Amino acid sequence: MRDSHLPDGWDVEGPVRAEVFMVWLNGERLELTGPDGAAPWILQLADSEHPVEAVDRIVSGLVGPPLLVHSTSWRRDRAAVILSFVAVIGPEQASGMASAPIPRAELARSDATRAPASIGHSQVLEHGLRHLAWLAQDDEVVAERLTGAWQDALAAYVPEPFRSLG
């Protein structure tokens, strides 16, 4: 995948996958859903695809346009780079797919210069929701999309500082 924002000589080669957490608000409770049930959805991205556009297109094809698609983190897993996304959908879009409440999880912690030894899906989603909570307060576009009950549901997700430097 060639990124036109990188200087010559810098390139991303090898498989890139999108890990999509489809999240919706069931009353006051955040839930995870998707075509494979309450689990992340793994998509192989083509070299020519922009990851955000690809996730938006694929989610739209499955359930209709999402309220929001945002990349929240990345990691290397075996031979691929995994880009994690939270795709926010409405309740009507979640109908017909298995869904489950999202439990809280401890964040995966790393050293100052190394990635965590292991990262679970629940930790990735926890990080993603904390990221979304921060954006809902700090980013005009996200704040316009995630109003009222979304703001209330995300209020408990507080970003934490990077502990390895303090």
Enumerate the predicted regions with their spans.
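Actinobacteria-biased recognition of intrinsically disordered, low-complexity terminal regions
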Residues: 1-16, 21-26, 150-152, 159-166
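Conserved Nudix-box catalytic region and its N-terminal flanking loop in Nudix hydrolases
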Residues: 7, 12-64, 78-80, 100-115
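Nudix hydrolase/Nudix homology domain
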Residues: 33-43, 75-166
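A short coil-to-beta-strand element that immediately follows conserved catalytic motifs
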Residues: 62-73
